[in-house]
Amino acid sequence: MNTLVALPAGSPAGVLQTILASNPAIQPRVIIDGLGAVIEAPTPVVAALSAFPGVAAAVTGALPAGLPVNPVLQPWIDAWNKQFDPAYQASLAARPAKWLTTGNPPPGASGTPAPPTSTLDGTVAFGLVTVNGPAAAALSPSDVIDINLGVLNAIGHLTRNAPDAARLVFVIEWQPVTLVGVVDPLSIPGPIPNSTFDDQENREKQWRDPALAAIGQPAGFPGVTNYRNALLGRTWWGGVHADKSIVGFVSRYNTAMSAYAAMGRLVVNLPQTDVFPGRIHIDRVVAHEMCHLFEAQDEYDGCAPFVMSGPFHAVNGNCISNPLATLGQAPCLMAGTSDDLCNWTKAHVGWQPFP
């Protein structure tokens, strides 16, 4: 049962470490820096945590208002609470398992695999950079809530599918950036069919590099790498250290594609995602792109059927163009037909050899 353990503002990092170590039945899934953790634990353990010294709340439902938590992190609380909103739950229940609803997704529906970040296991640090801007690039409060909820649910898909041996835990550092008087949204060209790396970079760098500067990092991919190293070098709430790190940029600034991932970072353009596959699928988009950063391959039309990925050098056997798929393509996150990972993708991200 997923439970959010929230701590009061200003709590020492060691408080969460004590909580996580207090019972072997507690399985952390996500640690949100400065707020607390999403854990899995039996109901009696959750009840005991509510009375644990230094805990503001331990809930399996919505957090009550008025808790003494860090107000800067209220969007994470709002995101958690939105899961329990009846209208949101109805939208989730109504969405189809197949979220890429065309035979060949329009340009920008996904990205390309990155050089290996390493296997998707251990403690993964995720630096989430939301880039707000003026006019058309302005992120509304509801946008930020939806982004944060999308990240939480994306991680939920991955940790639910991961084997126990992977010991997969995500730690999140949120960097909300607002660019003022730096980048005119109208100066950045819009999406382009069949975009190249240069097309993507020429658009992205115009707002990404100022965002990197705002968080104290150099421009370009050296800045992304530097930030990833900083995520690896710090101590997180709960006393944990990350084994690997990735960065995510989410914005309304124009990009060449709606979502893509390479070189240790993923990029999501909110307006394009709203058009396809839709805001309600943002968790699937984020999870899909995260998997790309750990060598997972696309499996829909246009995929590469015989490319080998991951530590087990598994071919892309669930690619719709692979002869093996004529026997029936398995539902899979990388095919856009499921929230779950097929056995081929599990091999690509390093969880198990196929099958």
Positions of predicted regions on the chain:
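Short pre-active-site segment immediately N-terminal to the catalytic Zn-binding motif
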Residues: L266-A287
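Active-site-proximal beta-strand/loop segments in catalytic clefts of secreted hydrolases
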Residues: V129-P134, F249-T255, Q272-T273, A296, ...
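Loop/turn elements at helix/coil->beta-strand transitions in domains of secreted/extracellular proteins
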Residues: G122-G127, A242-V247, G264-V267, Q297, ...
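Autoinhibitory N-terminal propeptides
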Residues: M1-A37, T43-P113
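Active-site recognition of the HExxH zinc-binding catalytic motif
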Residues: R284-E299
